[in-house]
Amino acid sequence: MLTQIANRDSRPSFWPRVREFAVPPSMIETATARRHVGDWAGACAAAGIDVDLNLRSLARTHGRELAAHVRADLRHLAPDLLRWHMPRIAPDGLLRPGLTIALARYETAGPNGACRLHLVVRTPPAWADAGQRISLTLWDGSHSGAGFPGPPHPHPHPSRRFRLDLHRHLWDARRTDELRIRSGADRLSAAARPAPDQVPAGPDQLGTVRQERPCAVDRWAAEAGILLHAEGRAAGTVVVRFGARHRLLLEVTADADGAEPPLFRIAPASREHGPTALPVLPDAATWVLPDLELLRTGSIEADRLHPLVASALVPDHAPTDRPRVPDRAGRTGLVECRGAQHRIGLVDGVLAPLDHDPAEIRREELLVALTGVPLPCLQAIDEAHRRPDCLDGVRERLVHGDIAGALAVVEGLLGPDALLRGGALRDELEAAAQRRIRYGLFRADMLDPAPGRVHVHPDRARPRGRRSHPRHTTSR
């Protein structure tokens, strides 16, 4: 499996699992209900987003007008949709760690003249990514993001590659209808993609791009035009990044009267174009939308998509209620026991054999305590406690932060009053609890990375935005 992941693109393999586990229906329903009544903070809490900003403080420091603009964006923020579209990494489809992503930019007056304030979301570093939490805050251009609450972040500056301020349809409920056009779903199908020789580019460069990964080459010209317009230019060169080492250049030429869409030519990147010399095409504009690719390949049904995504990509789709968490409560299992089929099911909140009387069960439990072989029914119950068939699903939900969904699966199988026995299931639940504690310590700025995770430069001065916390030290 590791060899396959290393030698091929793993996007088709992890995106179906991400769509099943990363943003559960209960999160979407709760966040949507709270957003509809104007409770943007409650919607963020339901979507696993920690709010690290205070609008009253913002009004005092930057004025009421700016605070009103930020509040308007927050009231229309769909945090569950934002989580749906966040950048993810292989092989498990977890959130890309250590990112600061700009959602919106605001012009404001600062102590040194006009400045730009950013509404950003941040993902924690990989060593503190328990629960796949996201933080929402403001960034004022300082190195450390000082002036706004929240834990110190390894990369406080908004990423040039991973940005959503030019893709508000991926988080703003007012503009979700734009997804169909911006993704190319309105005019492209799997059989209608242009051939490589129909796009002005070198066959070697374009052939590599189109074959290795599902790139949205057909949208690059329009998306590059949007990027250049945001930079105050009508034409120019844009860098397209495919990881740390693979880059291409888009040379965009605008039509003289603006009646026609911009033209572009793909060229190989050279060493002359440094990381800060040219604007970078946002990652959201580089690839084909994962949901669109899943629909085209038949890997997912429209019912499994986020409702706002499904309504944009499949306008004629009629949504139906289809819970994804299996409801196992009240179900009985069948076990081959002593030449007959016996039942096991929930009794008084615990999983128990249904075809054996209590006296027989007590004798069998005593036999097990004396190292005897238990009944097949008791063996099945013990296996369900230690390593159930649903373990993979429980693990996926825990990793993606769906604690409630994981516990619902466990309680549906073992009962709400079950006492877990030692085994893989209990280990997974305990590990998830430990990871949540680590994340809490990271949020409180009481925990640093483990030795070896961060390379420390002894000759580098401490950033001015950081200070020591004497109350966190221990006495000697």
Where are the language model's segments positioned?
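N-terminal membrane-targeting/anchoring modules of bacterial envelope and secretion proteins
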Residues: M1-Q211, A216-D218, H229, L413-R476
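Extended alpha-helical solenoid scaffold regions that build the rod-like backbones
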Residues: H229-E231, G243
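Alpha-helix capping/helix-boundary segments
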Residues: V217, E223-I226, V238-V239
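C-terminal structured domains
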Residues: G243-R476
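N-terminal accessory interaction module
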Residues: L99-F148, R241-G243, E251, A256-D257, ...
